[in-house]
Amino acid sequence: MGRIIRVTGPLVVADGMKGAKMYEVVRVGEMGLIGEIIRLEGDKAVIQVYEETAGIRPGEPVEGTGSSLSVELGPGLLTSMYDGIQRPLDVLRQLSGDFIARGLTAPALPRDKKWHFTPKVKVGDKVVGGDILGVVPETSIIEHKILVPPWVEGEIVEIAEEGDYTVEEVIVKVKKPDGTIEELKMYHRWPVRVKRPYKQKLPPEVPLITGQRTIDTFFSQAKGGTAAIPGPFGSGKTVTQHQLAKWSDAQVVVYIGCGERGNEMTDVLEEFPKLKDPKTGKPLMERTVLIANTSNMPVAAREASIYTGITIAEYFRDQGYDVALMADSTSRWAEALREISGRLEEMPGEEGYPAYLASKIAEFYERAGRVITLGSDERVGSVSVIGAVSPPGGDFSEPVVQNTLRVVKVFWALDADLARRRHFPAINWLRSYSLYVDAIQDWWHKNVDPEWRKMRDTAMALLQKEAELQEIVRIVGPDALPDREKAILIVTRMLREDYLQQDAFDEVDTYCPPKKQVTMMRVILNFYEKTMQAVDRGVPVDEIAKLPVREKIGRMKFEPDVEKVRALIDETNQQFEELFKKYGA
């Protein structure tokens, strides 16, 4: 028990804290606000408080809890909405109304709800950390696997029968090698700043299919990969992340709203229960965990929310699921680090950010990955991290963007000009890149189309050629270009408007399956080949531009039937044959 001697914003200094540990959770002041020790000097402790500190004064008590900031991992996580330190917001609302009173705590997992537990092991079985003890149907989509905590191993001496239990009831007793008995419940706690262990990291060879053509075809994300979405305000970072949370083929989605507008979290809460998962037809909310730490919540909790989210994601990964984690936005998290660092009077680095910004960002993204999990059955799980970055004024040379780009392998550069032109997703195809293309091309060739890489590279080269031609057009106008280059501009316009641009509000076009993506690309590249032949044979470019099939190609993104899209190849060939006859070519 210590006493407060100084309060500066979210930082509190207390003395008489002998025996306290780094990162220990403490209750601060008469109200019992939740805080975490972030520095120890002699018997003084510097505490960052996760709640508003107004009204706290020197002399009030500070009480240690003896444990570090941890999350509860067990059934009841999915469909929940938490704040940055895993307090369930719906329970807090019942306790204090629409505005959260200070010093409130509530268990993260519901204590009174009964879950139907089916055991998967029997008495006498040897178990190690990560083994599956049993399963609980948490939602209609996800079966929650009850795991042996990583630090436990031994022989099962008692196990509960199949039936309904709360998370507090003991379901298994394990006799450890030293003869002591460990009682296991359906949940365990894990410190958020410690990454959960695994057996082996695997190379990222499987793409995370998002149904967004720009991303899947050109700037692919791999399962277990890391991606950054930097962009200026209003360029569509949050909407792009919502699209990825809705349609990516991860089985579990953890969405962290970190320091962004509250209404954006409301959007997710209103939309996700109505939306259906394309694979199961069930509401998307049933596979989602939301962590809301909006801009009007205390700054210090922003820093914790990122760790809370990734720990929950790692827990589902350990069950053998593919998890996608969206962090929106890591810039606000970095700003929270900067504010706390400033209050600690640390030496500032570039633009006032702390000198350890780079290592903190790297530490977060390094927790992503595709792994063989702990346990005897060699499960494979993954955590893919997609972090939005909001640089002030859209300046990509800013420290948070630069340090993020050093660590992540995929860069989706959002462009305010494209967003203003209503081009969604506003990912600039000239500035973005993905370093996973080589690793995942085998998957595309085996499962979708053996010519995927060739078509992708051809289309990319055309888009780069268009950028060069646009500069000439701006200076001398389009009429000065030779026919061959005019024809390229026709095709690249089709690539931009009919392929890259997508309608997030259209039932069909909001999600484009891989087979359809490749077929659409084939249709456009077939048109390109025929166009080049026609120009070489002397057909005027204006005639090519007037072909009726162009309008159908423009509408193919709204066509759910892939065979009808494929039929456009024959139609294109036929119309070009007629052109060749007409011009005697």
UniProtKB/Swiss-Prot annotation:
Catalytic activity, per the record?
ATP + H2O + 4 H(+)(in) = ADP + phosphate + 5 H(+)(out)
State any GO CC term.
plasma membrane
The UniProt entry, under SUPFAM superfamilies, shows: C-terminal domain of alpha and beta subunits of F1 ATP synthase, N-terminal domain of alpha and beta subunits of F1 ATP synthase, P-loop containing nucleoside triphosphate hydrolases
Which top EC class applies here? translocase
Recite the UniProt keywords alphabetically: ATP synthesis, ATP-binding, Cell membrane, Hydrogen ion transport, Ion transport, Membrane, Nucleotide-binding, Translocase, Transport
Q: Look up keyword Iron and say if it applies.
A: no
Note one Pfam family from the annotation. ATP-synt_ab_N
Looking up InterPro entries in the UniProt record yields:
AAA+_ATPase, ATP-synt_VA_C, ATP-synth_a_Xtn, ATP_synth_asu-like_sf, ATP_synth_asu_arc, ATPase_a/bsu_AS, ATPase_F1/V1/A1_a/bsu_N, ATPase_F1/V1/A1_a/bsu_N_sf
Q: What is its EC number?
A: 7.1.2.2
Which residues of the sequence carry a binding annotation for ATP?
231-238
Q: Could you provide one GO biological process annotation from this protein's UniProt record?
A: proton motive force-driven plasma membrane ATP synthesis
State where the protein is found: Cell membrane
From the Swiss-Prot or TrEMBL record, what is one GO molecular function term?
A: proton-transporting ATP synthase activity, rotational mechanism
This protein's membrane topology, according to the annotation, is: Peripheral membrane protein
Q: Which PROSITE patterns match?
A: ATPASE_ALPHA_BETA
Please describe the quaternary structure of this protein. Has multiple subunits with at least A(3), B(3), C, D, E, F, H, I and proteolipid K(x).
Which family, according to UniProt?
Belongs to the ATPase alpha/beta chains family.
State its role: Produces ATP from ADP in the presence of a proton gradient across the membrane. The archaeal alpha chain is a catalytic subunit.
What is this protein's name?
A-type ATP synthase subunit A
Gene source species: Thermococcus sp. (strain KI)
